[in-house]
Every structure is written in C-alpha cells, then in structure tokens.
C-alpha cells in the first residue's frame, strides 16, 4: 500500500497545481518538512537574505504575471520580517501568497518560544489569512488563498502551517484551478457612461493601476484617440498610454500641484479607469462637487465624499471601454490640453539639458531613458527620486515602470528588480533608488549574484532621506532636521558582494556607464551624486505655475 503523503507534501503538490514555479524565502526550524517537500518538487526555491526581500520579490512577480507570487518564512521574527512586503502587495493590489511556519498546535495555548498568533497578525494586511489545523483541509485552504489573491482587486493572502500538522499524513489532494470568467458590465451603465462622455465639454481620463492589471492599455489609448480625450495616469499606471501619444498628459500624484492640475480645474467629467483611491487621493487631482465622475473598473468604487461616481461601469475594463466606444461620439480637439502638453514637453526638455555634476534629477532620468528600450523595466524605490520618476521618466508600455504607491515602502526596488529580471532575462532591468532605500535591502544583491540574475542598480546619492527633507523644507521655511547621514563607499560595497561597481563623476559619464553595466553578466551598481537643490526649485516653480492658471 502506498504511503500517504504528509500535509507539507500535499501543500507543495497544491502549489504545483496552482502553477507555482518559483518561491522566495528563508527556511526555519518550523518549515523543515515543507523545505524538503519543495526540494523534491519542480518548484525553484530562492533563499534570500531577509524575508522582506522575499515578500517584495513575490509582490513584483505577481504584478508582472497576474499570478500570485509566493514567499515563505518561519514563525516569529521570520514572519514579522515578511509583513512590510505583504502589506505592500495588499495595498498596491499585487497577487501574493505568504506561507509561514508555526509552532505545533499543542504549544499554541501556552507561552512559547517565538510564538505569535500569525493568522491574526496577517489579517489586517491580507484578503484572507488562514491556518491549516486539519490535514484534510490543505487543498481547500491553498486553492482559496490563490483564488482570493488573484480575483477582483488582487492582493495578499496568508497560509499558516503548524509544525506538527506539517508532519501528519494528509488525506487530501489539490483542487483544480477554475477558469476565471470575464464579468461584463450592465449595458444600461455602459449607455449612461457613453451619454455622459458624449455630452462632456472638457472630459479627462484618469487611468489608474486597475487599468494596467486589467490589460486595458490598448482600449484606453483607443478611447482617448477616437474621442479626443486627454489622459492623465497615476504613478502605478505609467505607460497605460504611450507618453508620445498626443493625448498623454503624463502623471499625477506628486505632493505639489502640477501642470496637470490645471486640466482637472477645467474639467466637467472625469472618466476614472481602474482608479484606486489608495494610490492617489481625489484631493490630489482636485475632485469637486460639480464634477461628474464615471467609474470604470473591474470592482465597484470605494466612494468617499470627494469620489462619488454618477455611474459605475463594473466589469472587464477593456470590454467596457470598447462598448462605450460603440455608443459615445465626440468631435473637436481638446485645445487647452494639447497646448498644456506642449508646455510640459518644452519644460521637461529644458530641465534635462543641464550638464552639471552632482547631476540634476531630470538629466539623470533623460539619460536613463536614452539607454532603456521601450519595453525595458525600471523599478523605482520610494523617496524624492520617485517624484522625479513620476514626473520625468517617459513610459510607453504598462508595467515598464514599477512603483510602490499604495503602501509606498522604501526598500522595494532591489528585490523588485530581481523578480523582474528573473521573469524577463532578455530585458534591461534597472533598480533606481536613493541611498536611504538602497541600504534597506541592499543585501539582496548577494542573492542576485548567487542566483545569476544580472540587473543594474542606480543609486542617487545625497546622504539624506531626501523626500522628507524636501517636505520639511517646504513646511518649515527651508529648514530641515534628522534626515542627514553618512554612507559607505557604495562602489566598494558592491564589489565586496561580487557585483560590478561604478561611480559617475561627470554628467557625460552616465550613459556610457549604464551601457557598460547592462552588458555585464553579474549585477552592477552605479552611484551618481544627485543635486537635490532642484527639489525646492521645482516646488517654487510649480507654485508660480498654479498661480498663473
């Protein structure tokens, strides 16, 4: 008679049935049975240097594939280290399944070494958090974890596996993945949306991350081009319409009011496509009571006093947009928007023409753009550089600029770039971070070397938490406090981890240095001193722009 598999072995069978081909994590004493079950499977397990890195890797894997990325930790401190990355996936809408080891069920009611109630701990930052307490339920728990992670607005889920349950024989088998069927919007809502758009005087499309997740880039672009409607994207929707499309008015979401706010000041109808309040609050784009909002998404709107749609078109986003195109009609060009775009293009070109060093942010991004192909991937960390990326890094396809902007966690870029390069080895992948963010997960460069995943990291060095310094200077008359620090020699640090290390000393060195770094078969780190005096200059300039509207 064939010996029955353990719960840990069946759990791994379930992961394989879900199509899992890679996992990220750190083994621990309470996950030993699971680790050996993974060893005997077809799944590639990548040991990382910090569980937060594992969670960010799973997060970006999920963003780019639409399938849940999987991360694993042991109990206690291993699980708490996962929390930041799991929370990031939850708020940013990235499908992720976190698996944690746990003490045996016989120890849970006692004061116990490293024991925390992980199911309760993960509940506020996941769509579903469940513990396997009976071996025969493993199939259902795994299937539901993936279903909830991937359906609707994606997000994180959590499975907790006690040590003694992992060892028990399990009379269970994997459940089959169900075919996900498209949900189509109510035709009366389609017609109502088409009527509002047709009758609008100055409509604006606001495209959010949901449009990217819904693979709606072609539909958004066609809607804009055929109905002559300008498009503003959130940070996480960069590339939803090519930046060189004449109706692209680029990105909204930096703390200051920008040129695009003038567009919203004049609009009567906002067509919100895949828009998520958690990423960019309505106050940032100037939602008003006299605006009419059309909400188009795969999920109903999260309403608040500033965001109350007149009509909600809930269903497959692309299909909804094509249906709206069949009933909406508009003629005439949005002259103000087109003129505003010309102003923005001229301003960006002028700001990128500076040859000084430390380099200006706009010049760095212009040079990066020249080296990167249209479908190459930039992964942004969080800091002042993120604001400049949002404003000055042109994108032409979705998922070519990955930004954490729901949870907005520092330390995202290096593990995120690792996952992107793992998935797309043929593409250039750049992690762009500040010196603060770099030090939060730089240890994963060793993981990249060991696993032979050669992406490039570009560090903007200013020896401070630049975004907070910028906000302090804005609010306290140019003064700042508690944001400055010293750095190690990043070039030598990179080389100590067997990466290639570079330092840029002149503006004209950046492009050839990037080109050389991308030719390497090992990870590379480039350090570029950045002139963040540009931050306050930009703030002053934007105040003048908004005063002239």
Task: Tell what function each PLM region has.
Residues 2, 195, 289-386, 493, ...:
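Phosphate/pyrophosphate-binding active-site segments
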Residues 30, 53, 215, 359-360, ...:
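A generic structural signal for residues located within well-ordered alpha-helices
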Residues 99, 107-114, 303-306, 312-314, ...:
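Thiamine diphosphate
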Residues 183, 354, 358, 480-483:
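Short, surface-exposed loop/turn motifs that are enriched in glycine and acidic residues
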Residues 1-328, 367, 371-377, 454-457, ...:
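N-terminal alpha/beta PP-like core and its mobile active-site loop of ThDP/TPP-dependent enzymes
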């Amino acid at each position: 008679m064939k010996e029955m598999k353990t719960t840990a072995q069946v759990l791994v069978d379930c992961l394989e049935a879900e199509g899992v081909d890679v996992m990220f994590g750190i083994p621990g004493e309470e996950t030993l049975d699971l680790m050996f079950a993974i060893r005997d499977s077809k799944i590639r397990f990548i040991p990382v240097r910090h569980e937060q890195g594992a969670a960010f890797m799973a997060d970006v894997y999920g963003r780019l594939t639409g399938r849940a990325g999987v991360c694993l930790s042991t109990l206690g401190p291993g699980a708490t280290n996962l929390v930041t990355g799991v929370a990031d996936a939850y708020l940013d809408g990235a499908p992720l399944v976190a698996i944690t080891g746990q003490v045996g069920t016989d120890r849970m009611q006692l004061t116990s070494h490293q024991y925390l109630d992980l199911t309760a701990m993960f509940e506020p930052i996941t769509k579903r958090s469940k513990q396997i307490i009976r071996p025969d339920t493993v199939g259902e728990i795994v299937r539901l974890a993936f279903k909830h992670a991937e359906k609707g607005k994606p997000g994180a889920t959590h499975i907790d596996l006690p040590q003694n349950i992992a060892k028990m024989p399990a009379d269970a088998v994997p459940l089959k993945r169900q075919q996900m069927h498209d949900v189509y919007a109510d035709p009366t809502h389609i017609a109502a949306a088409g009527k509002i758009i047709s009758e609008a005087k100055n409509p604006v499309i606001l495209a959010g991350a949901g449009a990217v997740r819904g693979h709606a880039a072609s539909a958004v672009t066609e809607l804009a081009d055929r109905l002559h409607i300008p498009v503003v994207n959130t940070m996480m929707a960069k590339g939803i319409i090519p930046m060189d499309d004449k109706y692209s008015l680029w990105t909204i979401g930096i703390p200051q009011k920008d040129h695009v706010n003038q567009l919203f000041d004049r609009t009567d109808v906002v067509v919100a496509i895949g828009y998520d309040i958690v990423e960019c609050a309505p106050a940032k784009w100037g939602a008003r009571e006299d605006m009419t909002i059309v909400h188009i998404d795969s999920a109903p709107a999260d309403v608040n006093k500033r965001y109350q749609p007149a009509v909600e078109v809930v269903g497959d986003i692309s299909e909804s947009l094509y249906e709206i195109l069949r009933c909406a009609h508009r003629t005439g060009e949005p002259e103000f928007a087109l003129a505003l775009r010309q102003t923005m293009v001229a301003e960006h070109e002028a700001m990128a023409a500076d040859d000084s060093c430390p380099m200006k942010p706009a010049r760095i991004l212009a040079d990066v753009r020249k080296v990167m192909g249209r479908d190459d991937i930039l992964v942004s960390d969080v800091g002042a550089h993120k604001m400049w990326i949002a404003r000055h890094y042109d994108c032409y396809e979705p998922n070519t600029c990955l930004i954490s902007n729901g949870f907005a966690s520092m330390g995202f870029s290096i593990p995120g770039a690792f996952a992107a390069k793992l998935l797309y080895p043929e593409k250039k992948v750049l992690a762009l971070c500040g010196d603060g963010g770099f030090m939060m997960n730089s240890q994963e460069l060793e993981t990249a070397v060991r696993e032979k995943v050669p992406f490039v990291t570009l560090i903007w060095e200013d020896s401070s938490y630049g975004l907070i310094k910028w906000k302090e200077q804005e609010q306290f008359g140019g003064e700042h406090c508690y944001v400055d620090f010293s750095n190690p020699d990043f070039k030598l640090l990179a080389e100590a981890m067997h990466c290639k290390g570079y330092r840029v000393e002149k503006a004209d060195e950046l492009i050839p240095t990037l080109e050389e770094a991308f030719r390497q078969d090992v990870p590379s780190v480039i350090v570029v001193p950045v002139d963040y005096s540009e931050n306050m200059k930009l703030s002053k300039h934007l105040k003048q722009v908004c005063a002239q509207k």
